[in-house]
């Protein structure tokens, strides 16, 4: 995963010069290093003792404080990054453990359901075998009844000796 805005490289202000304070357009000539003959560089007045020396010390103090703040920010970012890395690792371990437990539980449930299904399939197979057996017995009974019925029908069509004699005597 990418880190966004974490642990940026420290910014060094020691080698950088503070931006010049520009009060008017006249001072811009000194920024371009275009000095006209007879003109005095405005930076020369900053080197004079007096109120400008306190400005130089204030600027140095501000630079130091800014550098300290940047270092503190970078340290905080590094600590945050370490904290997030530890949190991520801990979370991964917990998720992994929970996943393993869930998987084990799923397999236990699958095993239990498989046993139940196997028992029911065995019962079903036994009942189907019994139904097939009863069906065969019923077919045999039907065939026997049919045979008996046919025999009875054939016997009723064939006159017995007495019936034949009776019929012969009528004529």
Curated annotation (Swiss-Prot):
Meiotic cells (at protein level). Expressed in the ovary and testis. Residues 52-83, 118-146 form a coiled coil. GO terms for cellular component: central element; chromosome; nucleoplasm; nucleus; synaptonemal complex. The keyword Metal-binding does not apply. Transmembrane segments: none annotated. It is found in: Nucleus; Chromosome. InterPro entries: Syce2. Keywords: Cell cycle, Cell division, Chromosome, Coiled coil, Meiosis, Nucleus. Signal peptide: none annotated. Residues 24-36 have a biased composition (Basic and acidic residues). GO terms for biological process: cell division; synaptonemal complex assembly. Residues 1-52 are annotated as: Disordered. Belongs to the SYCE family. Homodimer. Found in a complex with SYCP1 and SYCE1. Interacts with SYCP1 and SYCE1. Interacts with SYCE3. Interacts with TEX12. Major component of the transverse central element of synaptonemal complexes (SCS), formed between homologous chromosomes during meiotic prophase. Requires SYCP1 in order to be incorporated into the central element. May have a role in the synaptonemal complex assembly, stabilization and recombination. PANTHER family: SYNAPTONEMAL COMPLEX CENTRAL ELEMENT PROTEIN 2. This is Synaptonemal complex central element protein 2. The gene is Syce2.
